[in-house]
Each structure stands twice: as C-alpha cells, then as structure tokens.
Regions:
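ABC family nucleotide-binding domain
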Residues: 1-197
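Conserved beta-strand-loop-alpha-helix hinge in the C-terminal portion
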Residues: 201-223
Length: 223
C-alpha cells in the first residue's frame, strides 16, 4: 500500500513550514522520510545538497545527528538524566568532550530561560519546560533543519502559544529552517507556509505570511 502518492515538495533554507493533515493522511510518513527514519520506494529526496536514499543504519544515524534536530510531542527526554545531560546527549554521540558539551548545553538552556533548571529531572518539570529542554537538545548540534512532530500536542493552550512563539523567534532571528507537523489549524497558522496533505497527496500549499489563515485568525486560539 502506498501511503504517499506522487509528493512533489520543495522546502527552502530558512522557511517556517507546517504540514497539516488528519490522522492517516500521510503526514507522519512524510516526516519520517524527511527525518531519515524511513526509506521511500521511488523518487528522490535531497537534504542540504545530499541525496538521501537507501542508507545503512549507521549512515542514516550519522546524517540525522549532524543535519536534523527533532522535537517530539512526548518530549522523549531520558528520565534518569537531568536537563543539561539530556541536552548534551547529541554531542556525546558526536564525540564532543565532556567539558565542552556541558558548556554548550548550559548555553542553550540559558538561551531558552532554563539555566536554573539544568540539574532538574524531567519528572520535576512542567510540560512547557520539558519541551524547551527538547528544543535546546534539537538545536545544540546546529542542524540544517528542525522537524517538530506535533510539538504542542501534549501542552495546554497557553504553553502551546509560548512554544510556537519560540519556534517563530528561532526562524526569524537565526534563519532556522523549521518544519512542523500538526493536525491543529491554530498551530499551522503560526507558520509562514501551510502544506495540506490528505490521503497521501498534497492538496494545496498556502502562503501565510500574515498568519491569518482560517479558522483561527490573528486573534484566535491555539486549540
């Protein structure tokens, strides 16, 4: 069974994009291909000039670690490691020394307003704090692209707005390429381009620079 059918998609460096669709639409499969978690049957996927195709697991892990930052709905923090240790982890796999990776992790936690929470464990933090730790972990390798899979799905409305504002700032101030997968119109409305996918096919692509896509609008709610 083909989950995706004839997808033709370009995401330029520095774009802030959402891929929107209901459960079963194919958006998660597309994200897994973009994140080098799944292979594809035909066609071509190029990431930052590198063709991604039929890689060994070690090569796929190498590219993921150096080119992609992941943000997950469930945060995917390691429960027995504190915040700074969780943020350090991608650098550990890159072979960065302990002192340097600790310094860098503290720098990113400080940027996200969490320096004072560095020694706290995930079960001691709120959902918003855990997602900020996850964002710091995604950023620390200076990836080419951030892939955020339902990043507000486990958060309340207020915290969802804060997380999306943070992603907007990263895109605007650092030129970070960010792709958000969501089924929520309010989340998609915060991005500059909305790609709607249904039954494995891209329905339409909406430029959303004014952030007033229906049904939420500028004064709407996140959920």
């Amino acid at each position: 069974m083909h989950v995706l059918k004839g997808i033709n998609l370009d995401i330029e460096e520095g774009e802030f994009v959402s891929i929107m669709g209901q459960s079963g639409s194919g958006k998660s499969t597309l994200l897994n291909i973009l994140g080098i978690l799944d292979n594809y049957d035909s066609g071509e996927y190029t990431l930052a000039g590198t063709r991604i195709w039929n890689l060994s697991e070690s090569k796929a892990a190498y590219y993921r670690n150096r080119m992609i930052g992941f943000i997950f709905q469930s945060f995917n923090l390691i429960g027995f490691k504190n915040a700074v240790e969780n943020v350090e982890l991608p650098l550990y796999y890159q072979g960065v020394g302990r002192r340097e990776r600790h310094r860098m992790a503290m720098e990113y936690l400080d940027r996200l307003g969490l320096a004072q929470w560095a020694e706290h464990y995930p079960n001691e933090m709120s959902g918003g704090q855990k997602q900020r730790v996850a964002i710091a972990r995604a950023l620390i390798t200076k990836p080419k692209i951030i892939l955020a899979d339902e990043p507000t799905g486990a958060l309340d409305s207020k915290t969802s707005v804060e997380v999306m504002q943070l992603l907007k700032e990263l895109n605007r101030e650092q030129g970070m390429t960010i792709v958000v997968v969501t089924h929520e119109s309010g989340v998609a409305n915060e991005t500059n381009k909305i790609i709607r996918i249904q039954d494995g096919i891209i329905g339409n692509i909406e430029i959303n620079e004014d952030h007033n896509a229906s049904p939420f609008g500028i004064n709407g709610y996140m959920k």
